[in-house]
A protein has these predicted regions:
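H-loop (His-switch) and adjacent beta-strand-loop-beta switch element
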Residues: 175-188
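ABC family nucleotide-binding domain
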Residues: 1-172
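Short amphipathic beta-strand/extended segments with alternating polar/hydrophobic composition
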Residues: 36, 188-189
Length: 189
């Protein structure tokens, strides 16, 4: 999803992720009317099916890198031994093993974003919503993340990304441009 600032891109992601309510219309998630779900059902969907990569990271300052990555697995009820293995895999994948015991304030912005991405994908969601996932990364890291997202998509995860970067948008299969809350164009890549 692309468009100028204020076009409604992040709002659309929040509606798709069931964090915000639409003003009108219907939205179905896994054949369920998302616009009519109660908070308990929305929470269940978040835990089991949706991963979020936020532009502003939303890491928990009082938790280490490893604990931040582990948090969604605790909510999903994953056993401790399995959680540790899954966190270790993410730390290794993102070259952050040496930083596992650091707190977010001790990391650069790019490193914080990598932790946010690892946290979003550690539970292997069916839908990954990414709001400017490469916004605070240098270009090589950005390309690495885009290749990873592409691989996850090939493995069956649906990914909806908001970006201002044309090159990174082309990693997707479809580009939707939004202006003033309306779809301006919808192109297959």
């Amino acid at each position: 999803i692309m468009g100028p600032s204020g076009a409604g891109k992040s709002t659309l992601l929040n509606i798709i992720g069931m964090l915000d309510e639409p003003n009108e219309g219907e939205y179905f998630f896994l054949d369920q009317p998302a616009h009519q779900l109660n908070e308990k059902k929305k929470t269940e969907f978040h835990r089991n099916y949706v991963g979020f990569i936020f532009q502003a990271f939303h890491l928990i300052d009082e938790m280490t890198v490893a604990e931040n990555i582990e948090t969604p697995l605790i909510y999903k009820g994953v056993k401790s031994r399995d959680r540790q293995a899954m966190v270790a895999d993410m730390l290794d994948r993102f070259n952050m093993v040496a930083k596992k015991d650091l707190f977010p304030a001790q990391l650069s912005g790019g490193q914080q974003q990598l932790v946010g991405i690892a946290r979003a994908i550690v539970g292997k969601p069916k839908l990954l919503l990414a709001d400017e996932p490469t916004g605070n990364l240098h270009s090589d890291q950005g390309k690495e993340i885009m290749k990873l997202l592409q691989k996850l998509n090939e493995e069956g995860i649906t990914i909806i990304q908001v970006t201002h970067n044309e090159e990174f948008a082309n990693y997707g299969k479809r580009i939707i441009r939004i202006i003033d809350g309306l779809v301006n164009s919808d192109l297959m890549v």
